[in-house]
Amino acid sequence: MLRATLARLEMAPKVTHIQEKLLINGKFVPAVSGKTFEVVNPADEKVIANVAEAEKADVDLAVKAARHAFESFRMTDCQWRRNLMLRLADILEKNSKEMAALESLDNGKPYEVALNVDVALSVECFRYCAGLADKVNGTVPPRSGNFLGIVKRQPIGVCGQIIPWNFPLLMAAFKLSPALAMGNTVVLKPAEQTPLTAVRLGEMVMEAGYPDGVLNILPGFGATAGSEIARHMDVDKIAFTGSTAVGHQVMQMAAETNLKKVSLELGGKSALIVCEDADLEEAAEVATTRVYFNTGQVCTASSRIYVHESVYDEFVSRLRKNAEARKVGPGNDTGNNMGPLVSKKQHERVLGYIEDGVKAGATVVTGGKKIGDKGYFVQPTIFSDVKEDMRICKEEIFGPVTCVMKYKDMDEVVKRANDSIYGLAAGICTRSMDTALRYSTYLNAGTVWVNTWNNFCPSMPFGGFKQSGIGRELGKEVVDMYTEPKAIHFASRSIVKP
């Protein structure tokens, strides 16, 4: 996700336009109920928008529009869909500074990160999936006798997509780009904490020339909008990114209604293994960036760090120095590299975990406290003396907190790393290619990074093992998430009987 280096620092432009309505059938409209909800800047706790609140009636209208649009959009030429998505990518890139400023305001992340990571990778996702649009190939399996068999892939239909608050624009791009490229239509619900960039993206989709109803965007709450999408009998597929607990609920709702297709990208408690031969300066930088990037609100954050006992003290010293050097503050202030947590609820949750860790007997190496009286800021935090049955070691905190533990033997530490309900990501810092290749195979995670972390590329699949999810985003594998195979059997009418 994070590029090797961020572009030069620059001031975030002032946000001058915020779309506050729902997008249904090509028009921006208020909610049927007339309800709105407040969107708060997590850096200063001030209200920045009052956004229309979608509920069941709005979901019904959006699904109806998506179903109607699907009947024609599914039959469109794949090269036309490719060019349409390339146009959308160009529009997003042209407006990248505006979108980054809006994301920073909405989510709290540093403007430079929003610009060079969230927006830049979103553009790449749209361009990559545009390239897939005309490369979805069927097959002609061998058949016995005078028969012909063709297997083709076709779009699933109306796709519900529920987007998280940690990467609002980027996660929308992860899901929206393959869905539209394959010829599906979409009802998308952004997180209630961070709806602004998704709705602005909807304006760009309309500007690019997508037909009415192909994309519908419904800001709202999970209980009254997200659950209605997941339960809707005319939604064919649901894609969700968020916590494992809510993922269970989404899957249950899909099963209890029309057995709609489900793809889930869920939680993680990712382990980073620092080997005895690792470059400790590099390893400490990898760990620092990946623990505190996006204020730790990343499902792949290296929140469990296992360090060989021979280099443990030096590594912890380097990690502490790096953590204490982080510049924490509002995302739109130049030079800050860690913003606030996204909401009051998340702020209280993270501080609660830190308090629980202290009570359980873990040692705070650095950090552990909130910062200031305004905004949802928490110090970068490191725990040592952690036992693996502690909540801070087992549960996903989703904040700038990590646990650093010793190990003696690689086989032993891989077992410890795998002892989790999660399997989203893992990492190894080592100078040995043999070690990297061997143990990356043994780690039960959908992604393993070696001497790096959160290094995403649209051509590589992303998803989790175990309770970290079902299915994959990105890569060629994403085609399977938004198409269905159809077998067609032909009997020859020119069979000559003896």
Curated annotation (Swiss-Prot):
Keyword annotations from UniProtKB, A to Z: Mitochondrion, NAD, Oxidoreductase, RNA-binding, Transit peptide
Alphabetical list of PROSITE patterns matching this protein: ALDEHYDE_DEHYDR_CYS (PS00070), ALDEHYDE_DEHYDR_GLU (PS00687)
UniProt-listed CDD domains: ALDH_F1-2_Ald2-like (cd07091)
Source organism superkingdom: Eukaryota
One annotated Gene Ontology cellular component of this protein: mitochondrion
GO MF term list: aldehyde dehydrogenase (NAD+) activity; RNA binding
A biological process from GO: ethanol catabolic process
Primary location: mitochondrion
Pathway recorded for this protein: Alcohol metabolism; ethanol degradation; acetate from ethanol: step 2/2
Residues noted as binding NAD(+) in the record, renumbered to the chain: G242, S243, T244, A245, V246, G247
One Pfam entry name: Aldedh
EC numbers, comma separated: 1.2.1.3
Keyword Mitochondrion listed: yes
Cell location: Mitochondrion
Catalytic activity as recorded in UniProt: an aldehyde + NAD(+) + H2O = a carboxylate + NADH + 2 H(+)
Residues the record marks as site: Transition state stabilizer: N166
Described function: Could have an RNA-binding activity in addition of its catalytic role.
Entry's family note: Belongs to the aldehyde dehydrogenase family.
Protein name: Aldehyde dehydrogenase, mitochondrial
Species of origin: Leishmania tarentolae (Sauroleishmania tarentolae)
Phylogenetic lineage: Eukaryota, Discoba, Euglenozoa, Kinetoplastea, Metakinetoplastina
